[in-house]
C-alpha cells in the first residue's frame, strides 16, 4: 500500500491529499481492507498529514455501512453515497437508509449519481410533463439536484451526468 500511495502522490504532483477516498466499499472491498489493514494504513497517513480528509465511497447495504462506521468511523471524515430519487428506496441500493446510517454517525455526505448518470436528465415525456406542469422553469436536472442536495447531512452534490441532454 505504501508504494501505491506514494505513486499516487507523485502522479498528482503533491505532498499530501486534501481529500482521499477508499473507493467502492462493499462486502468484497471491506473484507480486503480488513485483511490488509487498509483502515490502519489510512489512519496512519492521516496522522502523518498525508491525508487531510479521509472518506469512502460506499456501494452496499446500510447494515454493512453501519458495521464499518461502528468499527472504523473515527477515521472517516465523510462518506460518499449514491443519492437520487430513483434509488432512494430501491432494495438493491437503499440510499435513504444508507443516508440515515451516515447521519447516525454524524458523517457529512458527498453525493454521487444525483442524476443517475444522466438518466434523470433525459426523462420520458410523461414524467417531464408532470414536472413542467408543477414548475415550468425547472429542468429535469434541477429536480434531481434539489432532491439530493436537500437531504439532511448532504454537504456536496456535484454534477455527474454522462449526458446533459
Q: Which residues make up each language-model segment?
A:
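Active-site groove signature of glycoside hydrolases
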Residues: 7-30
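Beta/alpha (TIM)-barrel catalytic core signal, keyed to glycine-rich beta->alpha loops juxtaposed to Asp/Glu
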Residues: 22-165
Amino acid at each position: 500500500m505504501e508504494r501505491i500511495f506514494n505513486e499516487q502522490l507523485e502522479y498528482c504532483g503533491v505532498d499530501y491529499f486534501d481529500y482521499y477516498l477508499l473507493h467502492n466499499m462493499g462486502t468484497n472491498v471491506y473484507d480486503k481492507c480488513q485483511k490488509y489493514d487498509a483502515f490502519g494504513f489510512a489512519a496512519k497517513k492521516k496522522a502523518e498529514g498525508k491525508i487531510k480528509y479521509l472518506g469512502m465511497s460506499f456501494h452496499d447495504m446500510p447494515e454493512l455501512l453501519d458495521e464499518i462506521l461502528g468499527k472504523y468511523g473515527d477515521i472517516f471524515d465523510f462518506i460518499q453515497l449514491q443519492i437520487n430519487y430513483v434509488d432512494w428506496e430501491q432494495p438493491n441500493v437503499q440510499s435513504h437508509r444508507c443516508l440515515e446510517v451516515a447521519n447516525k454517525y454524524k458523517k457529512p455526505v458527498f453525493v454521487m449519481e444525483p442524476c443517475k448518470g444522466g438518466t434523470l436528465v433525459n426523462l420520458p415525456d410523461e414524467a417531464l410533463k408532470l414536472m413542467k406542469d408543477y414548475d415550468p422553469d425547472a429542468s429535469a436536472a434541477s429536480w434531481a439536484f434539489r432532491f439530493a442536495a436537500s437531504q439532511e447531512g448532504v454537504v456536496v452534490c456535484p454534477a455527474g451526468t454522462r449526458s446533459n441532454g
